Curated annotation (Swiss-Prot):
Signal peptide: none annotated. Keywords: Cytoplasm, Kinase, Phosphoprotein, Phosphotransferase system, Sugar transport, Transferase, Transport. Its main location: cytoplasm. Homodimer or homotrimer. Seems to be a monomer when not phosphorylated. It comes from Staphylococcus aureus (strain MRSA252). Pfam families: PTS_EIIA_2 (PF00359). The active site is at residue 63. The keyword Transferase applies. GO terms for molecular function: kinase activity; protein-phosphocysteine-sugar phosphotransferase activity. This is Mannitol-specific phosphotransferase enzyme IIA component.
Length: 144
């Protein structure tokens, strides 16, 4: 999974004022990496209206609706580290992982991310990381 994280798609010390702004930043990074079309960003917002993507332990995993599968060019991940946190439906989120999965791969990606974040120590390491490499290492160790 760590191979889907490029250093260009890991953003440290992000400051956002809202959940919507965080979704837009994550979605734009997926667009910029060539993983999705622009329409996918709206699909991420649409999903959030139906069900929150807050996963617990300070993590949210925004992703598009099932109808948005046609907007996914290839699988991709982006990570926003938000040390100050952002309100996410009444919860504090410090890490946003935007995902786009091609050919049903999003369920596997969701599962691997959730497993990594199920350990509070991993969450702390990601929130406190000073480089993209440190964050990638947490995922590599969890995936081993």
């Amino acid at each position: 999974m760590s191979e889907l994280f490029s250093n260009d798609n890991i953003f440290l010390n992000v400051n956002v004022n809202s959940q919507n702004e965080a979704i837009e930043k994550a979605g734009k990074a997926l667009v910029d990496s060539g993983a999705v079309t622009d329409a996918y960003i709206q699909a991420m917002k649409d999903r959030e209206q139906v069900v929150s993507t807050f996963m617990g332990n300070g993590l949210a995993i925004p992703h598009g609706t099932d109808e948005a599968k046609t907007n996914v060019i290839h699988s991709g991940l982006t990570l926003l580290q938000i040390p100050e946190g952002v309100d996410w439906d009444g919860e504090v989120v410090k890490v946003v992982v935007g995902i786009a999965g091609k050919d049903g791969e999003h369920l596997d990606l969701l599962s691997k991310i959730a497993i990594t974040f199920s350990e509070e120590g991993n969450v702390d390491r990601i929130v406190q990381a000073k480089s993209a490499e440190e964050i990638k290492q947490v995922f590599e160790e969890a995936d081993a």
